[in-house]
């Protein structure tokens, strides 16, 4: 694989934060929430390559999509805006909450144009709503770069694989196998991390904890995606073996809805180590980790995929249809 276009957005490697007293074994937290003061987390790692491709293509604007409180939409609005791109996001409804309000405020405050899309209307690039948005931007004279829903661009997998290789270097010498837990929707982050760890030769297992709440997201897709990323990096696809990856359901609460048990785990993590995770996604994966850490040997690690930036007084024009999320 030749060198891919990339823009510098993060500071890496991010640290491994030890947490004692919450489980029979020490737990490590991979602090990717600290990789950028603008907006941290796995979405920003991915944007280094996604926005690198946009810049290389000569784009003046990016069009993406996500739910109303999407971490990806907020990250894109902030980072792409700072690089001079005009940002439009097609946003779908979801349950309201503190995380949704924060991300909407950050995206609007960064100047993103947020276009509400009714429930049931597809924003897939092949569908009418998405095609109309592209056509409108082009009519304004923009050169548009499309970023898939939630940032699930194939080049994002490369960013996550490099993160996996980064972790492998940090974890050498720790008791094996390395057991990584993280929240998952599209599973691309988990797939990339698994690919990087597999190519490193380190004994490991990546557990992607589904936060979508739909059985349709579970199945063999994670292994296939991880193998695709490994091949994209020039390695053997079968370096990622079936036992390297797990995609497990989370029964506590549906997508975007806090779960009381997971919320209590988030409180414990904050009290024990001053590490803050959101209750909708990160807390669910951490809850799952705590339920397994006593039964399996090795080193248990929670990958903090979110951003802990507060919205503060940042605010921009929010479409009337989205005001219900921030009021």
Curated annotation (Swiss-Prot):
Record keywords: Antibiotic biosynthesis, Isomerase, Pyridoxal phosphate
One Gene Ontology MF term: isomerase activity
Protein name: Nocardicin C-9' epimerase
Residues recorded as bearing N6-(pyridoxal phosphate)lysine in the entry: 43
Keyword DNA damage: no
Gene3D superfamilies documented for this protein: 3.40.50.1100
Family: Belongs to the ACC deaminase/D-cysteine desulfhydrase family.
Disruption phenotype: Disruption of the gene abolishes nocardicin A production, but the mutant retains the ability to produce the intermediate isonocardicin A.
Function: Involved in the biosynthesis of the beta-lactam antibiotic nocardicin A. Catalyzes the interconversion of the nocardicin homoseryl side chain in both nocardicin A with isonocardicin A, and nocardicin C with isonocardicin C.
Xref: InterPro entries: ACCD_DCysDesulf (IPR027278), TrpB-like_PALP (IPR001926), TrpB-like_PALP_sf (IPR036052)
Cofactor(s) this protein cannot do without: pyridoxal 5'-phosphate
Swiss-Prot/TrEMBL GO biological process terms: antibiotic biosynthetic process; L-amino acid metabolic process; proteinogenic amino acid metabolic process
Enzyme class: isomerase
Reactions accelerated catalytically: isonocardicin C = nocardicin C; isonocardicin A = nocardicin A
Species of origin: Nocardia uniformis subsp. tsuyamanensis
A Pfam family the protein falls into: PALP
Residue pairs linked by disulfide bridges in the UniProt entry: none
């Amino acid at each position: 694989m030749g060198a891919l276009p990339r823009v510098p957005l993060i500071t890496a490697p991010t640290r491994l934060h030890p947490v004692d007293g919450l489980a029979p074994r020490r737990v490590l937290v991979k602090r990717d929430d600290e990789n950028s003061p603008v907006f941290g987390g796995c979405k920003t790692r991915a944007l280094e390559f996604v926005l690198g491709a946009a810049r290389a293509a000569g784009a003046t604007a990016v069009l993406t999509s996500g739910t109303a409180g999407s971490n990806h939409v907020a990250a894109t609005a902030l980072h792409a805006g700072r690089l001079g791109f005009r940002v439009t996001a097609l946003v779908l409804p979801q349950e309201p909450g503190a995380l949704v309000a924060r991300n909407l405020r950050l995206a609007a405050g960064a100047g993103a144009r947020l276009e509400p899309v009714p429930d049931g209307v597809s924003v897939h690039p092949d569908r009418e709503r998405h095609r109309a948005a592209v056509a409108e931007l082009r009519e304004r004279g923009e050169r548009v770069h499309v970023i898939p829903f939630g940032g699930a661009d194939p080049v994002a997998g490369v960013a996550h694989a490099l993160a996996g290789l980064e972790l492998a270097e940090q974890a050498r010498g720790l008791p094996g196998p390395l057991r990584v837990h993280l929240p998952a929707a599209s599973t691309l982050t988990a797939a990339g991390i698994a690919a990087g760890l597999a190519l490193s030769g380190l004994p490991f297992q990546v557990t992607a904890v589904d936060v979508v709440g739909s059985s349709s997201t579970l199945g063999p897709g994670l292994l296939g995606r991880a193998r695709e990323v490994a091949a994209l990096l020039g390695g053997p696809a079968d370096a990622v073996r079936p036992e390297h990856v797990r995609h497990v359901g989370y029964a506590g609460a549906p997508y975007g809805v806090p779960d009381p048990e997971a919320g209590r785990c988030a409180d414990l993590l904050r009290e024990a180590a001053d590490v803050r995770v959101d209750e909708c996604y990160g807390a669910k994966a951490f809850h799952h980790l705590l339920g397994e850490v006593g039964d399996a040997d090795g080193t248990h690690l929670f990958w903090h995929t979110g951003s802990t930036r507060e919205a503060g007084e940042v605010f921009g024009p929010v479409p009337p249809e989205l005001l219900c999320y921030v009021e």
